[in-house]
């Protein structure tokens, strides 16, 4: 509101905060976040963009604001990491300091892991993985916690698939797009695939 009303503005909505808080927050927090987001989107002379048609439609539905669809940028080095070989492991990839990422990964390890009948090797890439919250040693789950990696896309592109168990959050998940750009399939929950067009359905397994 402190910016000159005559100056055109571009607002880029990576995700719709209202959807995120409606899934996981208290009633009071929902009201506060929706009010704050509405104030931001009502800036005068602003042009709103979002990465998915789903979020464009949500902004229209909740805030009655027209939103333009734009594509997320994928670096050329990621696209060029198409797999030259597929090795015998899966990947999990993200900033594990984010609650929704850590909770999903721990759910998979502690709940799905004990059900595995064959040995499965998973390379976990990214900062802040909560090792201490892995409840038990799972016999058929070999976890390789790599932490921060300078070039995660080589590891990603040579894996069998990215595993992305998400139960909260909103917006397009960039790590899912990056995995698809690397040429590998993704195994995830419906929230992991939110906003992606049906064009990619053959590369996505909702589990």
List each language-model region with its residue ranges.
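Carbohydrate-associated surface elements
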Residues: 54, 72-73
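Active-site proximal beta-strand in glycosyltransferases
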Residues: 4-22
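Membrane-proximal helix-turn-helix segments that form the acceptor-binding/catalytic region
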Residues: 17, 27-48
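Short hydrophobic beta-strand element within catalytic cores of glycosyltransferases
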Residues: 175-178, 185-189
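Conserved acidic donor-binding segment of nucleotide-sugar-dependent glycosyltransferases
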Residues: 203-207
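A short, active-site helix/loop in glycosyltransferases that binds the activated sugar's phosphate group
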Residues: 38-66, 129-133
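Acidic donor-binding loop of glycosyltransferase active sites
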Residues: 157-171, 182-185
């Amino acid at each position: 509101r402190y910016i000159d009303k005559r100056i055109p503005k571009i607002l880029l909505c990576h995700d719709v905060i209202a959807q995120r808080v409606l899934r996981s927050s208290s009633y009071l927090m929902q009201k506060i976040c929706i009010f704050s987001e509405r104030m931001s989107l009502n800036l005068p002379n602003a042009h709103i963009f979002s990465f998915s048609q789903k979020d464009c439609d949500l902004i229209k539905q909740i805030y009655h604001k027209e939103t333009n669809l734009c594509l997320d940028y994928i670096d050329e080095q990621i696209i060029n990491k198409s797999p030259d070989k597929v090795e015998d492991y899966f990947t999990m990839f993200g900033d594990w300091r984010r609650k929704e990422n850590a909770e999903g990964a721990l759910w998979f390890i502690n709940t799905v892991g004990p059900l595995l009948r064959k040995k499965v090797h998973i390379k976990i890439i990214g900062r802040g993985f909560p090792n201490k919250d892995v409840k038990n040693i799972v016999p058929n789950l070999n976890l390789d916690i790599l932490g921060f990696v300078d070039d995660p896309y080589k590891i990603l592109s040579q894996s069998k698939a990215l595993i992305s168990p998400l139960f909260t959050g909103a917006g397009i998940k960039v790590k899912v797009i990056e995995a698809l750009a690397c040429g590998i399939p993704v195994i995830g929950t419906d929230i992991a695939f939110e906003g992606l067009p049906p064009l990619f359905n053959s590369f996505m397994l909702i589990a």
